[in-house]
Structure formats: structure tokens, C-alpha cells
Amino acid sequence: MVTLITEKLQSQSLDDLTCKAEAGPLQYSAETLNKSGRLFPLELNDQSPWKVFSGGPPVRSQAATGPDFSFLPGLSAAAHTMGLQWQPQSPRPGAGLGAASTVDPSESTGSSTAPPTKRHCRSLSEPEELVRCRSPWRPGSSKVWTPVSKRRCDSGGSATRQGSPGAVLPRSAVWSTGPTSPATPRPSSASGGFVDSSEGSAGSGPLWCSAESCLPSTRRRPSLSQERLAGAGTPLPWASSSPTSTPALGGRRGLLRCRSQPCVLSGKRSRRKRRREEDARWTRPSLDFLKMTQTLKNSKSLCSLNYEDDDEDDTPVKTVLSSPCDSRGLPGITMPGCSQRGLRTSPVHPNLWASRESVTSDGSRRSSGDPRDGDSVGEEGVFPRARWELDLEQIENN
């Protein structure tokens, strides 16, 4: 797109068009018009030709007797051979082509107010930079061609001269409507062909004017066609957009970009989960590791279970499990006051139950008055020396 625009601008500049326009009614061949990028030979409806009058918008003449253009509708091929004539009815020095305007700045007295303060939508707003890029030719809306909205044009177009010498358009040229322009949209018959929309077209056509009398119009175009950007002299802005050229980009900086940065958000979530796991890890264990280490340290046999913190209420149960009394008493009812010999009379496996007897028969040994048990009354379950002696006594008794 940029290369096409550059080639068109190199082939014929705006100054050539202005100089030829000041010479009066001239003949333009189709090749020259195609190279200029300003005017294109398209079909015109002979029932509604548009005539340009000096100092006002173009007026539609009902009679087809005096058309402004010398070619007939549908004969675009004939336009290449015969050439095209553009004849305003009253030739003025201000009659120009392309971006030149025939409206005198003193005559544009149309009621125009200030533009809206806020641009609610970029497609509905038309910035001042687009005025420099607008091309006057626009094809009519049809089933094949539909205008496509473009991004805002930030290119600084070259200033074009009006017909009067010395009057140069400023860079901040804006749109204004004619004095008798209604609010109705432009008819489709005027959209196509050789009608110079810069001359002013009923309501929506642009008018080029100087900075003294031009004010931006309240009505703005909703779409920007590709042909309006044909007159740009610099590369188009979508190659490198900035927050100044596109104000919508500035507000997006503070927003979260979840789709483009998923790893950052996932890392934050994982860190929060790890903190929760660390907090729950300290309340999680329900086992007493101190007791487990003490049991493993003090046990010398597989069946030794040393409970240092047990009360005396658990001793009869352990006595029942370890060594029941003789067959004369009930096996399930065993008191801690029974004799030590009665506890040792009928052990099924003396080696297995030896450690538990040492724990549960403290009271019986106290009654028997064994001198060896006086020093280690509370330490029988901890030290295995007394346990091995008890095992030897059980073997001798059996």
C-alpha cells in the first residue's frame, strides 16, 4: 500500500495538478488521471449529473442536456481514447482539482459547532490527521465493494494550494459543511465517477478550507475507506503505532494480560498453594516420634514393649495377656496380688512373655522379698538384665 502511494506521488505531484487547474478547462487523459491517484474514470449516471457552481456545493441538474463530463455511462474504455474534460460553468482562479477547493474562505458561512469532547469509539471518530490523507474519489456501494474501516492515519500529508496564488492549506485543515448542506447522506449516484467530492457534496462531502474560517463539523464519517488514504505522503501509521497515535493503547497498560502471560499468574497461584501446604504440615502428624525412638532404643528383643508412662490400671490386662494364672483360677480374671510362682507356673512360651512379666509382676516380687529386686523396682522394664534372669528361672522351674 505504501509503495503504491509513493509511486503515484512520484509520477505526478500536487503542484502539477494545481498549475494545470489554473490554466482553465483542460483535457486529462485516463492515463494521467490513473497515475495521479486523485481522479479515476468511473461510470456516471446521466440522469443525475452534478454541476459545480462557484462558492457553493454542487447542484444537481435535472436536465441531462448540459453534463459537465464528456463521456457516457458504461464507456470507460472510450475514456482512454477521447480524454476527459472538466469544465466548471464559471471559470474562476480558485477552480482546482484533487484536494483543491473552489469555495472561498469568506463565503463558507455554514453553521458549524465545536467537535465533541470525547471520542467514544475510534471507528466513529475522524481525527484531524485523516483530512490530509483523504482522496476525493470514492466508489459507490455495491454488492462487491464495501467500505472497510481503517486505523487512524497519522501521516503528515503535503499541503495543497488553492487556486489563488499564495493561499496554502495548513496542516491542521479540518472538515466543514456547506451553507445549504442537509443532514441526509450522500446519494449513491454521486458516490461513483468523476465527481470531485472536495468541491463539496450535499451534506457529507469534505470541503478544504483555510485555518481562518474552518471549524470541525459535528457530523463525522463512521468508516474510512482505503481510497481516502491514497494521498498520504509518508508511510502509514500501523507499521509503528504509539499511544499518541492510538489513544486506546495507553489505557491497556495497566490491565492484566491473562492470555498473553499465563506463566506469571500460574506462578503466583503455585506460591499461594505452597504456603498453605507449609502451614498444614505442622498440624498434620498425629504420631509421637519421641515414644517411637525410645522404644527402638531400649528394646533388645522382638516382643519387648516398654511402656514407661502406663498406670497401674493397665497391669491386670497385661498380666492376662502375658502370663495367665494356673488352671485353678479363671484365665480372664487375674489380680496383681497373686504369687509370682502362680504367675510363672504355666507359661506357654516363656521367652515371649518374659518381658511383660517383668513389667506386670512388680507387686508380687515386692511381696516375695527378692533382694535383687529392691534396687531395680522401677527399672525392670527398662534394663534387660533382670529379664534374662527371669527367663533362666522359668527354664529351671519347667
UniProtKB/Swiss-Prot annotation:
Region named Disordered: 85-253, 336-398
Biased composition (Basic and acidic residues): 123-132, 363-375
UniProt motif Nuclear localization signal: location: 268-276
Protein localization: Nucleus
Entry keywords, A to Z: Nucleus, Phosphoprotein
A Pfam family assignment: FAM53
One biological process term in Gene Ontology: protein import into nucleus
Positions with biased composition (Polar residues): 103-115
Biased composition range(s): Low complexity: 176-193, 234-250
Modified residues (Phosphoserine): S125, S301, S304
Assigned GO CC terms: nucleus
Disulfide links within the chain: none
Family: Belongs to the FAM53 family.
UniProt xrefs under PANTHER family: PROTEIN FAM53A, PROTEIN FAM53A-LIKE ISOFORM X1
Function summary: May play an important role in neural development; the dorsomedial roof of the third ventricle.
Protein name: Protein FAM53A
Organism: Homo sapiens
Gene: FAM53A
